Amino acid sequence: YSGGVPPTGIAQPPGRTPGSAGASTSETIKSAPAPSKDCPGCTAARESLTLGALAARQTNRRTSACAGALRYSASWADRLPADVPLYPGARVTEAAGANTGACALRAVSFSTNARLQTVVDWYYTRVTNTGFTAEHQSDGTQHTLGGTRDRDGGAYVLFLTPRRD
């Protein structure tokens, strides 16, 4: 399948500032804390060519052990947990997942026309409102937002890179 790439602001509602799509929800958006400068996950993301390679490099053994079980299909983007959903208006570029006995893993790569800080703040709001911790890291170019939740052992990590266009 191939087709033309639509203009970046094609889904932008009238009167909205370009790059702010997805910022309006029923939640009050909280500002994520400033990132720490230590970002080992940023290097892993930059050096990984696939979602499976990135999963294999995670420090969490449960996640890295499941990397080999990942299967690629766009349908995995529809199976993200409700507490860590796909960003509104996101354009999925790659999706993978595993749902076996010991592995419940989802990985999705997407792009959006929203500013990086808007996306970080939106996810920070979503995850902290549902009981996850949130640690924001950056190496100056790449950002990560990751955390865990005690009540169910859930974990997430987001790797974010600003677009150059």
Where are these regions (language model features)?
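An acidic-aromatic pocket/loop used at catalytic or ligand-binding sites
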Residues: Y1-D165
